[in-house]
A protein has these predicted regions:
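Core mature regions of organelle-targeted
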Residues: 8-124
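Hydrophobic membrane-targeting and insertion signals
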Residues: 1-7
Length: 124
């Protein structure tokens, strides 16, 4: 599995190349539009798997208001999935509202985990 750090570096590389950016950005926007998570009230960072120590640490570092909002969105999405419904377009998450609120915390937790691994494996 790729780390979020490597994904961010790849995204920065793509965005720094105008030709790649003209091809990849519209495709990624189309993918996000058809993925359907926004129609269930979720943001992209809400669908990242949280069953690993780095994600658990990143989620625990979220400010209280972001954490409550995230939990509310996930519970709402579960309820919509159980009832086989989607949010009306007025309540669905808009593309400009779909911010990467969790990525800085994940990058920080990955950096700390990498540093800890390096220090644990140091040879004197």
């Amino acid at each position: 599995m790729a780390s979020v750090t490597s994904i961010v570096k790849a995204a920065d590389f793509i965005l720094s190349r105008p030709t790649l950016s003209r091809v990849v950005v519209p495709v990624s926007k189309l993918f996000c539009a058809y993925a359907g998570y926004r129609e269930m009230g979720l943001k992209f960072n809400d669908i990242i798997a949280e069953e690993n120590p780095i994600m658990t640490k990143a989620i625990s570092r979220l400010p209280e208001d972001l954490s409550y909002a995230r939990n509310y969105r996930i519970i709402t999405a579960h309820q919509l999935a159980l009832s086989h419904q989607l949010l009306p377009p007025s309540k669905a998450v808009k593309p400009e509202e779909d911010t990467h609120y969790l990525i800085p915390y994940i990058l920080e937790a990955e950096k700390e985990a990498f540093e800890k691994q390096e220090l644990d494996n140091i040879e004197v």
